[in-house]
Amino acid sequence: METKRLTESKMITLEHINLVVTDIEKTLTFYKAAFPHWAVRGGGVSEWHGKPRNWVHFGDDYQYITFNDDGVGDNRDLTGHQVGLAHFAFVTSNIKSVIERLAIAGFAIDKEGADNKYRENVYFIDPNGYEVEFVQYLSDLPCERNSYD
């Protein structure tokens, strides 16, 4: 039973994140800089509860982010305690390149991650107020990668 559960859990991966934004092109500026190997996979026009919106799928053959341009108002206050998305994170093999590409595209680091000898991480705010973390692991050992010292 334990082997079956372990095998099934390894088959589950995150396919996509669906984000409501205000401007798809501004949003793509950020994500294209972060993910130069990703592309717009498709898109179109749809309606969400009576409001028309444009949408795109931006990613690769296996994972993507959906951007829908029917957003109004501001994203949640990241310093507050409202229910909602705090941040999401992506693993990279070269965090310095991600930082450099985002800087060239006009995006500065919002905050540095905590000092840890097994990983480096930084946080950016995308054009819609979503906090996006990038992390580079400096070890292949799970006990080191997942250390909380």
Residue ranges with predicted function:
Residues 2-10, 14-23, 43-44, 53-57, 76-149:
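Vicinal oxygen chelate
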Residues 2-28, 85-90, 140-149:
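N-terminal beta-strand motif that seeds the catalytic metal site of vicinal oxygen chelate
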Residues 9, 48, 80-82:
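A generic structural micro-feature
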Residues 11, 18-63:
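Core segments of cupin and vicinal oxygen chelate
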Residues 60-64, 71-73, 95-96:
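Short, charged/polar surface micro-motifs in flexible loops or helix N-caps
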Residues 64-66, 131:
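Short hydrophobic-acidic sequence motifs that mark active-site Asp/Glu residues
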Residues 67-69, 136:
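Residue-level recognition of conserved beta-strand positions in structured domain cores
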